[in-house]
Design a protein with these regions (language model features):
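Helix-terminus/linker motif at the lipid-water interface of multi-pass membrane proteins
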Residues: 42-61, 130-137, 193-202, 260-293, ...
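Short runs within selected transmembrane alpha-helices of multi-pass transporters and secretion channels
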Residues: 81, 150-168, 176-184, 205-220, ...
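N-terminal transmembrane alpha-helices
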Residues: 17-54, 68-83, 87, 112-119, ...
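Transmembrane alpha-helix boundary and packing residues in multipass membrane permease domains
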Residues: 33, 37, 49, 86, ...
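Small-residue-rich hydrophobic transmembrane alpha-helices
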Residues: 60-120, 157-176, 270, 283-341, ...
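Transmembrane helical elements of multi-pass membrane transporters/channels
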Residues: 28-47, 149, 183, 212-216, ...
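Short alpha-helical transmembrane segments in multi-pass integral membrane proteins
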Residues: 1-30, 88-155, 197-253, 309-374, ...
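Hydrophobic transmembrane alpha-helices of multi-pass small-molecule transporters
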Residues: 72-75, 187-191, 217-221, 293-296, ...
Length: 459
């Protein structure tokens, strides 16, 4: 990455993503993101491992029953921060200091407010939603308790994702990694303390999670407050700038809803899983940790795609937009393929991290066997969505996701799965929905890419 210097240069000590060899740049940019995402996954796995090994399969199933619901909320916040990332990248690439500062301060308030809203929804409706999902009666109390405590950390999660989006947009992927590492170590230590020493089971894991989330939010906020760059944060300048807030929401809300819709569709899948035994539910919960592991490694390349396209679009460099999309998608596909095959070969040792029950491990292998050869297909869908978002387009990709993933998956559950009634037939819907959605997203991206490059040529 090219590093610009000089007292008057806005990009001082930051990564310039508009020049240099793209293959090497995208890879180097993504490495800290991969480690950051992996750490987050590993720390979440530590939650499940501690519960599964020291609190039993019932506690493991209770925590696992909340996974989709937690993903719905966190997915919305991540999508909202994606709008922040795109706009900061655009203004940073265009060297537009005024709009950059206004975007940062509007985004800080917007994300914090979203976190508070989700806190209220999660705490107020946890029981009703879990009952609607046919959560097993023996898992209900633990699941409701875990979810209500976990949702207390939503404002912190929103603020951390805001800060992470800002730093990633300007090419700094290292600081969020450092902060997450510190918070993650705290999370693991507190997990062990609350569960083993204090015998708090699912409540202990949830409390440890929210403490670490607030710690990471404080660290990233402090870094923005200390910064002297144009993307710095100042409490005195916090306000909702109408045009900037509207721009953030126009990209962030569709992106957030898109992520939430995936989780919403998965609620129907969880409902299908819940029709099987408690052992199958626990095995599914253990195996879904593999999903997070693979998706979050691939997600690093999608983040890189959005940041690179955002800066280059802002700088008017159309030739690098297409190449960024192709390279980042190829990286994501390769990562999904390699990790999937690794899980296929080492599935049982992986599952043994979360449970010692042979029957639960057998149930987990059903999921790993199907999913391990399917993960790489999602690169074509998510990579294209990230590229469209980098060009400032997220509404149409959201509609495509609603139809290709949410609606399609619901139809699958009530037709194909209802007909065959096997867990394998339930898991197969992932690869089919990814393929259909990817085809539509690629067609749309080709259209907006041609329009964007034409606009840049005419400017």
């Amino acid at each position: 990455m090219t590093i610009k210097g000089g007292a008057g240069d806005m990009k001082t000590a930051q990564a310039d993503l508009t020049t240099g060899p793209l293959g090497k740049q995208i890879f180097r940019f993504s490495i800290p993101l991969i480690f950051s995402n992996l750490l987050q996954v590993l720390f979440n796995m530590a939650d499940v491992a501690v519960v599964g090994r020291f609190a039993g399969s019932t506690a493991l199933g209770a925590v696992g029953s909340t996974t989709i619901f937690v993903s719905l909320f966190t997915g919305f916040l991540i999508g909202l921060s994606g709008g922040v990332n795109v706009l900061v990248a655009h203004h940073f690439g265009a060297d537009d200091q005024k709009n950059l500062s206004d975007t940062v301060h509007s985004a800080a308030l917007t994300c914090a407010a979203a976190g508070l809203v989700l806190l209220g929804i999660g705490c107020g409706f946890a029981g009703g939603i879990l009952r609607a999902l046919n959560t097993k009666p023996e898992l209900m109390d633990g699941a409701v308790l875990y979810l209500r405590i976990y949702c207390l950390g939503m404002p912190a999660l929103a603020v951390y994702n805001f800060g992470n989006a800002v730093f990633s947009a300007v090419g700094d992927t290292r600081r969020p990694l450092y902060y997450l590492s510190i918070a993650g170590v705290i999370n693991v230590v507190l997990n062990l303390f609350f569960v083993i020493v204090c015998n708090m089971d699912v409540a202990g894991v949830a409390v440890a999670s929210i403490i670490s989330q607030y710690f990471s939010a404080i660290l990233v906020t402090a870094a923005l407050l200390r910064s002297r760059e144009s993307y710095c944060l100042r409490f005195s300048q916090l306000r909702f700038h109408k045009t900037r807030t509207k721009a953030i929401l126009s990209i962030g809300i569709p992106s957030g809803l898109q992520n939430a819709i995936f989780a919403l569709a998965n609620l129907f899948i969880q409902r299908g899983v819940n029709t099987f035994s408690a052992t199958m539910v626990a095995g599914n919960s253990a195996a879904t940790n593999a999903d997070a592991l693979v998706y979050d490694v691939m997600q690093a390349f999608y983040t890189a795609c959005g940041s690179f396209i955002g800066q280059n679009y802002g700088a008017g460099k159309k030739d690098r937009i297409r190449r960024t999309f192709l390279i980042s998608t190829a990286y994501a596909f390769g990562a999904g393929l390699l990790l999937g095959l690794g899980l296929l070969l080492f599935g049982r040792p992986f599952l043994s991290l979360f449970t010692t029950d042979p029957q639960v491990m057998d149930a987990g292998m059903y999921r790993l066997t199907v999913m391990s050869v399917s993960y790489c297909v999602s690169a074509f869908m998510d990579g294209t969505i990230a590229a469209s978002r980098g060009l400032g387009k997220s509404a149409v990709p959201m509609v495509i996701v609603i139809l290709g993933s949410c609606v399609f998956r619901i139809i699958w559950v009530y037709t194909v799965f209802a007909w065959f009634g096997t867990i394998t037939s339930l898991y197969l819907l992932y690869v089919f929905s990814w393929t259909i959605t990817a085809a539509a997203e690629i067609i749309y991206f080709i259209r907006i890419y041609r329009q964007a490059t034409a606009d840049l040529a005419a400017a």
